[in-house]
A protein has these predicted regions:
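Glycine-rich cofactor/substrate-binding loops
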Residues: 1-37, 98-99, 281-458
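A helix-coil-helix interface module used to build multimeric assemblies
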Residues: 1-189, 193, 199, 203, ...
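Short runs of predominantly hydrophobic/aromatic residues within well-ordered alpha helices
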Residues: 38, 85, 89, 236-239, ...
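Positions in alpha-helical segments
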Residues: 40-43, 119, 123, 237-241, ...
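Generic, well-ordered alpha-helical scaffold segments in large soluble proteins
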Residues: 41, 62-69, 91, 95, ...
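Charged, flexible cofactor/metal-binding loops and thiol motifs
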Residues: 117, 122, 129, 144, ...
């Protein structure tokens, strides 16, 4: 397939350069968006009297026929085409003749590709947002069921204070809600400015109606500067950053799932459909889904780094370096979509094991803070109460006891403020339900969080 730009060249381009220069293998996924932009651009050319209405009709008929063939599977994309724009234009011209040659009037591939990427990422962002909402809903449903399942909360991966399974899961729901907001914000900024009509960099001499094309394509307005219009890839970086942050949250959740389903914790059981086995160890039930999410997170970080490094030193306006944006951003999109598609049903089908959680919570003195708070509420300064409780814990460790196993006389050896009600104060359920501060682990708080988060998804 010949290049669109061969008018000046005195020699045919070396085949190795053609192979090196071609982007059709990764930008062909934008073919629907390329056609969408061309339909609107050609309609505008007709409205402005730049091309005839007959040309517009022929162009639209040809573009729709390409779309029909694409959807039916009959369209064969030429792997030798330089890029998706070349393929569409030359396929169109082969079908409708000279009208196809008029499509590119007042347009450059520079503003064309800047538009296509935006349209493609808009659709991708909307799809990912829907996936995140589904995952948040699953987390909320599991949290609602586990709102009363007491488990250890951890700092430094050491047992720290009692929380509930529902409270822990809702932490991830809130993280993902922020991810949803970041994607929405980035998409809103991307949709604020339409680059179509910027030309190669300096606009055009044709009387284009850029406000018409911007409106028809779902943008708030045309971009205010034609050089910025073709040079901008901020939207790729911002969306990729939002996706990388989401992957980070999925990776943290995955790490906890990996721990929780191990025999060392056994807080949950993953459905067999979402685990794998070993070729040599018959007892194994491996959480491969979560391990792959953890690994793929680094891949999306790499995509973001690629975009940042690619853009950091190139002068205005368009440079061929920018062709490398698509593989990075599309890989980030595909990776996040794949992870979300897999992790959501995995979490929906996991089985919590509350008895194991409770047994783990009974170890490690995670009610020590509550013991110190008990003394503080009896009038002892908190720092003294902290020291007193620490001394008690050290003694219990030496003697192989828990705080609950101390007699009242033993408690009183450390402070006369202890009374019979200390046993209620350090009961694990009481510890959770007593933390009534907003956002805490009480059952009522978890259920309120579930309701609030689900309300934000509506």
């Amino acid at each position: 397939m010949p290049q669109l730009w061969q008018g000046r060249a005195s020699k045919a381009v070396d085949s190795r350069v053609n192979d090196f220069n071609s982007s059709i293998r990764f930008d062909a996924r934008m073919i629907e968006q390329d056609i969408q932009g061309s339909l609107v651009h050609s309609a505008m050319l007709g409205r402005q009297g730049i091309i005839s209405q007959q040309d517009v009709d022929d162009i639209h008929k040809g573009l729709h026929s390409i779309l029909d063939d694409l959807h039916s599977g009959a369209l064969e994309i030429d792997p030798n085409a330089e890029d998706v724009h070349t393929f569409v234009e030359q396929t169109l011209t082969a079908r409708v003749g000279d009208a196809g040659k008029r499509l590119h009037t007042g347009r450059s591939r520079n503003d064309q590709v800047a538009l296509d990427i935006r349209l493609n990422l808009r659709a991708a962002s909307e799809h990912i947002q829907g996936q995140i909402k589904e995952l948040i809903t699953v987390l909320c449903d599991q949290a609602e069921k586990g709102a009363g399942y007491v488990m250890p909360g951890y700092t430094h991966l050491q047992r720290a204070q009692p929380v509930t399974f529902g409270h822990q899961l809702m932490a991830y729901a809130w993280m993902l809600l922020r991810d949803l907001g970041r994607l929405q914000d980035a998409t809103r900024r991307m949709d604020a400015e339409c680059p179509l009509g910027s030309g190669a960099l300096a606009g055009t001499t044709y009387p284009l109606d850029r406000f018409y094309t911007a409106e028809q394509l779902g943008f708030a307005a045309p971009c205010g500067n034609s050089i910025d219009g073709v040079s901008d890839r901020d939207f790729c970086i911002e969306l990729c950053s939002a996706m990388a942050t989401c992957m980070m949250h999925l990776s943290r959740l995955s790490e906890e799932i990996i721990l929780w389903c191990s025999w060392e914790f056994k807080f949950i059981e993953l459905d067999d459909a979402f685990t794998t086995g070993s070729s040599i160890m018959p007892q194994k039930k491996n959480p491969d889904v979560t391990e792959l999410i953890r690994g793929k997170t680094g891949r999306v970080y790499g995509d973001l780094n690629t975009l940042l490094v690619m853009m950091k030193g190139i002068p205005l306006a368009y440079d061929k370096d920018m062709q490398e944006d698509k593989e990075a951003i599309f890989d980030a999109v595909d990776t996040l979509e794949l992870c979300l598609r897999t992790v959501t049903p995995m979490l929906a089908t996991m089985t919590p094991l509350p008895a194991n959680m409770r047994r783990a919570a009974a170890k490690g003195f995670i009610n020590a803070t509550d013991c110190a708070d008990y003394l503080t509420k009896k009038g002892m300064p908190f720092r003294d109460a902290y020291k007193c409780t620490g001394t008690m814990v050290a003694a219990c460790i030496r003697e192989g006891k828990t705080l609950e196993e101390l007699t009242l006389d033993e408690f009183k050896q450390y402070s006369d403020l202890f009374a019979e009600d200390v046993y209620t104060a350090i009961d694990l359920t009481t510890c959770c339900e007593g933390r009534t501060s907003y956002g805490g682990p009480t059952k009522a708080s978890v259920l309120r969080q579930v309701s609030e988060v689900k309300g934000k998804l509506a």
